[in-house]
Every structure is written in C-alpha cells, then in structure tokens.
C-alpha cells in the first residue's frame, strides 16, 4: 500500500512539472514538451494541450502542495524569472524524487527480502518435499532396478550356461558330423572300388556266361548224341544180358563145382596136416561162429590165395550171426574219397569205419556162394535193410564187377544196387557208364554204373545238414536220392549158413 501511495504522489508531481516547465514545438503542431536533466539521465515529457491559462491550474496545484513559494511579480523580465523559478522547482522536485526513491528502495528492500525469504522458505519446503519424494521414488526405483539387474544377471547366467552347453553340444555334433563325413567319404571310396570291381566282374561274368552258353550248346549236342548212343547200347546190353544169363548160370555151376573141390581139398589138408590147419582155421566169420565164437568182435581169418591173414569184424548178432563185415560207416571219422589202390587193399579200422578191400572181397566170394546184407539207419534212428541171396565180385581185370541176385528187405521195394552188373569206380579210375565221372561228382568209390541210385561211400553229413546232398551216403529207395544216411554196414555170409 505504501508503494502505491508513493507512485501516486510521484505522478502528481510530474503533472505539475509538466504544466510549469512546458514549451511548444513549432514542428509538432503546438504540442508541449518538458525536458528534465538529472545527472546522466534526461527525462522528456509530452504534455497535452489546455484551453485555459495554465497559471491558474498551476496556482491551484501550488495551493495543495506543501512545498510552494510566493508567485513572482510579473515584469518585463518575466520569462527568465519564470525559468529560474521552474528550475528551482525542479530541483526541489528532484530532491523529493530522490527521497521518494530512497524510501521506495528501502521499503522495497525489506519487503523484497521478506518476499524472497518467504519464497525461499516455501520453495525450500517444496523442494524438500519434492526431494524427499524423489529420494523415496529413487530408492524404490533403485530397488526395482536392483531386482531387475539381479533378474537380468540370473537370466544372463542361465543363458551363458545354456550357451556353453549348446556350444559343447555343437562341438560334439560337429565332431560326430566330421567323423560321419569321413566315414561317408571312406564308404564312397569303397563303393567306388566295389563298383569298379563289380564292373570288372560283370565283364568277366559276361565272358564266362558266353563261354558257358557255348559249352551248354555243345553239351546239349553231345547229350543228344550220347542219348542216341545210350539207347543203342541199352539195346546191345539187353541182348548181352540175355546171353550173359546163360553164362552166369554156367559160372555159378562152375563156382559150385570149385567150392566142392575146395571143400574136398580142405578136408584132405585137415587130415594130412593138423598143425597147418590150426594156423588157418577160419575162412570167414561163419567158420568163426560155427567154431563156437558167438560174440561180435574182431577176428583173424585166412582167405584163400591171400599171402597173409586178415583181421575182420564179425557180427554175431544180426539174423543168426556169422556175418563178415566188408564196409561200415558211423561217424564220418574216416575219409572215403580215396584212390583205386586203397579201395583194392582196404583202409580204416575194423572196429570202426573201414573198407575191407576189393581184393579180399573177391577172394572171399570166390571161395563159395555168399549172401550180402546191407544195414541202414537214417538220422532219425529209423532202421532198414536190403539183402541179396547171391553176391560176388569179379577180379581187378574185371574192375571188381558186381554180381547180385534175389533182392529182399525193408529198404525199398526195388534194389538201389544195379542187379545186372556194374564196374567199380574211384576218383582216379573212371569205370562208370557216364561221361560225367560219377566218382568225382558223387565222391567215394562205388559201383556207380551211370551214377545210379546208391553210394554208401559218399560224404558223411551230420543231422540237420544231410538233406539235399547228392554226394552223401545215399540209398535211393529208402530215403530218396538226396538224403545222406547216418550209418551203414555191408556184411556177407555163406549162402548155406
């Protein structure tokens, strides 16, 4: 309020100064200007126009002013006096203005200081509140930021661990992939080599196939020719068989005569030389049996026209006993794929697998008429036999040709041995009636004829592997042409036993 009154008082003084110290400017159409110089500052006031005499209004103003002087007398030197008077008034006004200014400055200082202090206090309180709020918010945000940072660190740790695991897995996978790539490269190389070899083999096979095809055609031509020749030979054989029957009868009669003569000679020898008879008591196992030895086992016999005695196995149990074993198979421990000389003189052990020998069989069957019995057993334990009432073989010049008559038994209604005669063949002596060499193809030594329905000296096969074996121990009319038997025994006994 004090400041407002001071400004009002200042405005009144300025108005009075404007009326007292005014002048017109001829350039501005009669406007009045009042200029005041105070120190370095100059103040110019533009006063409005008045119709009346300014003196009266000035006088009225002076009447209300506490600092006024007596009006000067109007004289000839009125203008200079008036100017002096105005200057004096201006000095007074200037002093008043300075006082007012000082007063205002002093009051304004205290009031401004108070206002500033209040403003500072209010502002400080507000700032404190704001600061407190900011501190609390900052603390909360710091806590949240710490939590977020912790979560980020945890997540980062998990991601780093997972990344490490993934890196290890990737390394392992890369290592495995590299190994597999190397293996694939090796396989490709092997495949290339195999493909090259296959191509070479295909070329060779093609050449061989062409060769085989040509050979097959040649064989077909040859078979056709052989078939025709065989048919012709069969016709000749039938004619020869008819002629041979008469010869066989004559031969049998001669053999009976020879046997009778041998018996007479034997009796004469027994009567004349007792000690010598003791050294050669048995011609075969029938003599052993008749001498009172009825247990199966190995005995020594003395065969006519043989320089030394021979150990043989005598079967005293089957069908009355007295059987001389000439062949036995049971376990495959002995190889029967042998040559002509071995089959001639025999091989093996009489107590196990063995072949008596073609020369001894010929010598025995030349003494008297003999019966042949063949005991068979398959891999399932089934037994059968074939028996021939007349059996003998020719000498070596006749290739130990087989002669049989009167087949009976349980090993098939038909005989698996050739009844009309067949020569003995081995791997080094091909005497069969086939171009294929049966002894090499079917193995062993046997009376093959044209690779006929039997071969008891073939390869031995164990149970489970004995089916589909053309080169096994076979007896066609007992188990078929490709079934290999487990056990066989060939034995002979005199017909008149």
Curated annotation (Swiss-Prot):
One of its GO terms (cellular component) is extracellular space. The keyword Disulfide bond applies. Its main location: secreted. SMART domains: FBG. Keywords: Angiogenesis, Coiled coil, Developmental protein, Differentiation, Disulfide bond, Glycoprotein, Secreted, Signal. Residues 1-19 form the signal peptide. Disulfide bonds join 285-314, 438-451. GO terms for biological process: angiogenesis; blood coagulation; cell differentiation; Tie signaling pathway. Residues 158-256 form a coiled coil. Glycans are attached at residues 92, 122, 154, 243, 294. GO terms for molecular function: receptor tyrosine kinase binding. Residues 276-496 form the Fibrinogen C-terminal domain. InterPro entries: FIB_ANG-like, Fibrinogen-like_C, Fibrinogen_a/b/g_C_1, Fibrinogen_a/b/g_C_dom, Fibrinogen_CS. It is found in: Secreted. Binds and activates TIE2 receptor by inducing its tyrosine phosphorylation. Implicated in endothelial developmental processes later and distinct from that of VEGF. Appears to play a crucial role in mediating reciprocal interactions between the endothelium and surrounding matrix and mesenchyme. Mediates blood vessel maturation/stability. It may play an important role in the heart early development. Homooligomer. Interacts with TEK/TIE2. Interacts with SVEP1/polydom. Interacts with THBD; this interaction significantly inhibits the generation of activated PC and TAFIa/CPB2 by the thrombin/thrombomodulin complex. This is Angiopoietin-1. It comes from Canis lupus familiaris (Dog).
């Amino acid at each position: 309020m004090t400041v407002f009154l001071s400004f009002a008082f200042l405005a009144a003084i300025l108005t009075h100064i404007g009326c007292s110290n005014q002048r017109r400017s001829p350039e501005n159409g009669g406007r009045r200007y009042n200029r005041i110089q105070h120190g370095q500052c100059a103040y110019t006031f533009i006063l409005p126009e008045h119709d009346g005499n300014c003196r009266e209004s000035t006088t009225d103003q002076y009447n209300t002013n506490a600092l006024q002087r007596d009006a000067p007398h109007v004289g000839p030197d009125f203008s200079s006096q008036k100017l002096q008077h105005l200057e004096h008034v201006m000095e007074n006004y200037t002093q008043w203005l300075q006082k007012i200014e000082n007063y205002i400055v002093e009051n304004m200082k205290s009031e401004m200081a108070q206002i500033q202090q209040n403003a500072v206090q209010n502002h400080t309180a507000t700032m404190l509140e704001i600061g407190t709020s900011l501190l609390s918010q900052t603390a909360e945000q710091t806590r949240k930021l710490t939590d977020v940072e912790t979560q980020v660190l945890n997540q980062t740790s998990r991601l780093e661990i997972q990344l490490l695991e993934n890196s290890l897995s990737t390394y392992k996978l890369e290592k495995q992939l590299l190994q597999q790539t190397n293996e694939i490269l090796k396989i490709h190389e092997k495949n290339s080599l195999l493909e090259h070899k296959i191509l070479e083999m295909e070329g060779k096979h093609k050449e061989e196939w062409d060769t085989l095809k040509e050979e097959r055609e040649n064989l077909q031509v040859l078979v056709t020719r052989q078939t025709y020749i065989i048919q012709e030979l069969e016709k000749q054989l039938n004619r020869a068989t008819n002629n041979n029957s008469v010869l066989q009868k004559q031969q049998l009669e001669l053999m009976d005569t020879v046997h009778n003569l041998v018996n007479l000679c034997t009796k004469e020898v027994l009567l004349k030389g007792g000690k010598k008879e003791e050294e050669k008591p048995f011609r075969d196992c029938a003599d052993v049996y008749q001498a009172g030895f009825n247990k199966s086992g190995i005995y020594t016999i003395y065969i006519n026209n043989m320089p030394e005695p021979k150990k043989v196995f005598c079967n005293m149990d089957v069908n009355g006993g007295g059987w001389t074993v000439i062949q036995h198979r049971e376990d495959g421990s002995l190889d029967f794929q042998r040559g002509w000389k071995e089959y001639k003189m025999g091989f093996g052990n009489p107590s196990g697998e063995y072949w008596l020998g073609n020369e001894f069989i010929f010598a025995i069957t030349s003494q008297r008429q003999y019966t042949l019995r063949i005991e068979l057993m398959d891999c399932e334990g089934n037994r059968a036999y074939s028996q021939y009432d007349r059996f003998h073989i020719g000498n070596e010049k006749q290739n130990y040709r087989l002669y049989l008559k009167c087949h009976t038994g349980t090993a098939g209604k038909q005989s698996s041995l050739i009844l009309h005669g067949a020569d003995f063949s081995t791997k080094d002596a091909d005497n069969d009636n086939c171009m294929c060499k049966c002894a090499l193809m079917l193995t062993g030594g046997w009376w093959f004829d044209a690779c006929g329905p039997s071969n008891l000296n073939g390869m031995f096969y164990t149970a489970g592997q004995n089916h589909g074996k053309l080169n096994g121990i076979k007896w066609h009319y007992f188990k078929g042409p490709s079934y290999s038997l487990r056990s066989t025994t060939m034995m002979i006994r005199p017909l008149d036993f």
